Every structure is written in structure tokens, then in C-alpha cells.
Amino acid sequence: MEGKSASCPEGVVSWYIRTSRLAVALAIIKLRPPGGARQFTESLAERLKRQDESWKSKAEGLHEDLLHLRQELLLTRTLLNTRSSAGQAPGQEIAKVLSQDDTREVNSGTLQTCLPPTPPNSQKVPPKDRQWRQDHRLTKHVQFLQRLSGLRSGFEESLCQDGDVVWDSVVQLLDCVVEDFRQAHTGQPLRHPEQLHNAIQVVAQTLSPGGARQGFPVQHFSRVEDLLKEMVNLLLTNQQLNAFSVQDSLSDCLLALGGNCCITRTPLIQLLMSQIIQLAQQLRDACEKSREEHEHHQVDWVCYQNSFYLFWLLERLAQDTDNRVNQELVVRLETKAFPLADEFSLFSLYMWRIGGLFRAGDS
């Protein structure tokens, strides 16, 4: 009798386990989408990808809002520490600078005529199309950097105390410019190229005065280098119908970064040289395979044609006497030029010329 009662709970537990397994199996079968396991996996992966992109977009938006608040705080703090020569009260000076739009000229054009209208409070503006948000984001960073650089007495102090805000703003502004070129790389028209060029000049002007003396944080400098690499890659691989106008604008932006900014000049020159050396090696490999296999091997003619933009940039950057270029790259550039003299004589001649220009500049 006792053995029978002892086995009863075990039977109940076993029955509950079988029932639970059956319920789980039925739930899986019911929730399983039509098709096979492959379709289910692809559907799940797509759903997770959309969710990840949504979270990433929200995180970027929160980062932008936080950075904007830190920008306003830094401007306010800098203004409080700055005394007007006319004896204006700090509160009045803060209100005046934060409320006015910066209309200082940059080269031949003014940013005020290029930038889209900025609402007084971005938090109250409903979300609009991607291009509007992109323009608005670029505008905010440009205005902050211009206003901060306008406070000449407090600019270097800001770099010492809150340099992270300044450098983060520089990286975000440069990313805004690159984003427009990314869209143009997919065939979309490049809107307001003068706005992008002026924004790049703001970046160069911000980096030039205090960056060399105060030091550029490693994490931000690494991000700037990545964006420079992406810009050069976009310049080298563009094959859209709007290539000429986009290439000219992108070349001008790179020239402004390399010519007016001592921090990015040397990395940009070395990056351009490395890209040319890499392309020269690809051309040489194609020529050797053609000789060995007695058949024509395809050459990346898009990169070959666009490489002359890189030569043009290097020729312009070589005119600056303050060039600290790795001479090993110059030697490699000249060495790679000789094997291409027969098949790609113009390319080889340009390589030899660029090597000579940078050797002369170094001597």
C-alpha cells in the first residue's frame, strides 16, 4: 500500500513533464512561419537586424542630444570666464552670443547663406526626413565650433578643461560631411557642396590653433584617421554619373584638411601614398599574370582613372614646406614606378614625379 502511494507522485510528475513538453512542441509548431527552417532563420535575423538598427539610431540620437547640451554648457562657462572690454554684464553677453547666428566669412562664402534654417529648440521639432536631420546636425556643430573659436581668449582654456567636447564635435562634424559623400557615392545628388567645404574649413581651423599645442586625444584622432581613409576610398572608387562634381568637391575638402591643418596633413599624405603604392602593386600583378598566362587580366580602371585625383592632391600638398613624410614611403613609391613604365607610363611618371617632389621638400 505504501509503495503504491509513493509511486503516485512520481507518476504525476512524469505526466506533468510529458504534458509540458507537448505544450512547448505545439507552441513551436504554431509559431513556426510557413516555409522551412531556413526561412525562419532568415526572418529572425532580419527582425533582429532591424531592432539593432533601431537601437543604434536611438543611441546616436541620445549621444547627439547629450553632446549639444555639453556644447551649450561649455559656451556658457567660457562666456562667464570672459570679461567684455566694454564692461558688458556676463548674462547679457551670454544671451547675445547664444542667440545670434554666426555670420563670419570663411574664404569666399558665408556659412549663413549655405546652412539651412535652424529652429530655436531642436527638442521640440518633430522628426523629419533623413536629409533634414543631417543638415541640422551639421549646422549645430558648425555654429558651436565657430562661436567657441570666436572667443579667442577662452578657446585654448576650453581645450584644456573640456577638450573632449570640442574634439567630439570635430569628429561628429567631419562624420556629417563624410555622410553626404557616402550618399553621393550611391548615386544621390550632392547638395550644397559649398556648405561641406566650409564645414571642412571650420574643422581645419579648429584643429590648427590649439590642437597641435594641446594634443589630440588618441580615440578621437583614430576616428579622424578612419574618416580620412573613408574619404580617400570614396574618391578612389566613385563610378557614378555625377562623379566629376563629387570628385572635385571631395578633393577640395581633402585638400583643405591636408593644407590648412597640421594635425591631419602628414597622415593624409601617407594615406594617399599608401593607396597609390597598393594600386601600383595591383597593376603590376595584373601585368605579370598577363605575361605568364598569355591572356588579358582585368584591371580596375575605375580606381586607375580616379588615382589621378590622388596624384593631384599629393602635388598640391607637396608645395607646403612643412612636410614630415615617412621617407620609406617615398622610396617605395619610386621603386614601384619602374616596373610600370612600359604598360602604364603616365601612372609611372606621376609616381616618379611625386616621389621627387617630396624628396625635394624633405631636403
Curated annotation (Swiss-Prot):
It holds the Pfam family Mei4. The keyword DNA-binding does not apply. It is found in: Chromosome. Keywords: Chromosome, DNA recombination, Meiosis. InterPro entries: MEI4. Required for DNA double-strand breaks (DSBs) formation in unsynapsed regions during meiotic recombination. Belongs to the MEI4L family. This is Meiosis-specific protein MEI4.
